[in-house]
């Protein structure tokens, strides 16, 4: 399914997306679930998980094309969306980078798994690479592996 939106709406979505440091799909999903009053934690978590899967698939496609900058951003999106899914299950919304980082610390401590924090830092490097384009290909490849491990650990800890 695809959704066609007026240019004015798309520009507003992109503006909010940039201001919140999220991807446009998340803004659109949030608006739809709020409009439909489907604000229960499990629905929100499912949306974030689906976005995480989509972004990881996109990252892999960009890797195949040799576009490591876009692959970096999509992998970051996959990690942040899976973290938001975990938070949503608890009734928590993470709307800033600071909130994401604090929640990672909470999860790592609760599970006694400090590797979660380190893997999250790899995702953060990928996010920065989207803006700076300074990571060599090999680091992007390895950091995306870290993101996959991060996602796996979050899923296993449920």
Predicted features and spans:
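Short amphipathic alpha-helical segments
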Residues: 2-5, 13, 20-33
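Hydrophobic recognition helices of helix-based DNA-binding modules
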Residues: 35, 82-86
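Short, positively charged interaction helices/loops
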Residues: 39-61
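Amphipathic, well-ordered alpha-helical segments in soluble domains
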Residues: 51-55, 81, 150
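Solenoid-repeat scaffolds in large eukaryotic assemblies
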Residues: 71-72, 78
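Long, charged low-complexity segments
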Residues: 87-158
């Amino acid at each position: 399914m695809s959704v066609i939106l007026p240019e004015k709406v798309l520009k507003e979505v992109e503006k909010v997306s940039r201001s919140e440091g999220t991807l446009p799909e998340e803004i659109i999903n949030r608006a739809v679930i709020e409009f439909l009053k489907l604000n229960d934690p499990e629905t929100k978590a499912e949306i974030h998980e689906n976005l995480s899967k989509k972004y990881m698939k996109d990252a892999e496609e960009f890797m195949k094309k040799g576009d490591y900058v876009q692959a970096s951003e999509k992998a970051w999106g996959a990690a942040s969306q899976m973290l938001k899914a975990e938070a949503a299950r608890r009734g928590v919304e993470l709307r800033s980078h600071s909130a994401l980082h604090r929640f990672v610390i909470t999860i790592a401590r609760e599970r006694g798994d400090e590797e979660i924090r380190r893997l999250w830092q790899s995702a953060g490097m990928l996010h920065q690479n989207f803006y700076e384009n300074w990571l060599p290909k090999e680091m992007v490849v390895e950091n995306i592996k870290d993101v996959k491990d991060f996602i796996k650990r979050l899923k296993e800890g449920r």
